């Protein structure tokens, strides 16, 4: 398939630049992957859609305030977007400046040069930096960092984003983009779903800035997926096995939860074992033709045209059904991308 097969026209005004006043106030488009039928509703409908005995899988990563502003030794301005923390002092980052800093030079971070870091080496599009401070990189980010809003939101971050560009159940710092399907859940809705008899499980996938990188090839088979760190612990494996045994469904909240679970499934298949825990980097690229191993239903936001994520959804619900649902969403003025509306999709099994 060609990347252009996943194009759709999106009016600029449908890109959500701010969240709704309440997390659960977003709209929800239901899609049946077998029939292609769509149904308009509100996100609170999730409470009716999740059944007793189902397992809802969330990504508990925490978005770090990964964007820092500073300057080079020469005085030129720069912007640093942390991609991954290697340890408490060393990190990989995207660096934007008029001229790339050279290895061995210092950069000063913060509005008032509060901190400095040494440029250690360049790794493709990323730079390895070493923080010169008696604090950890996480502590420095919490002090001077900005929330790394996606480029299409096209505005500076605001104080409210520290709360709203973060799920209420986040636990493990490391993401530089939010697992956005989870942004729609508040604590009340979570409690109501649990009270129905559904179970919860938590995976971790630290979403990288690569999630916003455009696909730069024409043939999707030639695309090389960016790497992200994921964890599927033993208790999640046990919960999935128990759910399948009782006839319940595995409902993944977000494409990052899907990619975590399916990474564990693929690794186990490769090793010829039953489902095992997974800890490590994943480059899993899911597109039409992929056979899902674990996930039965998917809650997800609306994704960018020609992105790997709309390809993942197309593999889940069927290409035609997905593209038709997106046309319906555009025609009915759904809000798109990170702060936008959501879908509840039942997997295509026929």
Curated annotation (Swiss-Prot):
Gene Ontology biological process terms, A to Z: queuosine biosynthetic process; tRNA wobble guanine modification
Molecular function (Gene Ontology), one example: S-adenosylmethionine:tRNA ribosyltransferase-isomerase activity
Reaction(s) this enzyme catalyzes, per UniProt: 7-aminomethyl-7-carbaguanosine(34) in tRNA + S-adenosyl-L-methionine = epoxyqueuosine(34) in tRNA + adenine + L-methionine + 2 H(+)
Superkingdom field: Bacteria
NCBIfam families: PRK00147.1, queA
Binding partners and assembly: Monomer.
A cellular component annotation (GO) from this entry: cytoplasm
One Pfam assignment: Queuosine_synth
Protein purpose: Transfers and isomerizes the ribose moiety from AdoMet to the 7-aminomethyl group of 7-deazaguanine (preQ1-tRNA) to give epoxyqueuosine (oQ-tRNA).
Keywords per UniProt: Cytoplasm, Queuosine biosynthesis, S-adenosyl-L-methionine, Transferase
Gene3D superfamilies associated with the record: QueA-like
Family: Belongs to the QueA family.
Protein name, UniProt field: S-adenosylmethionine:tRNA ribosyltransferase-isomerase
Location (main, coarse): cytoplasm
Record InterPro entries: QueA, QueA_dom1, QueA_dom2, QueA_sf
EC number: 2.4.99.17
Pathway as given in its UniProt record: tRNA modification; tRNA-queuosine biosynthesis
Location(s), subcellular: Cytoplasm
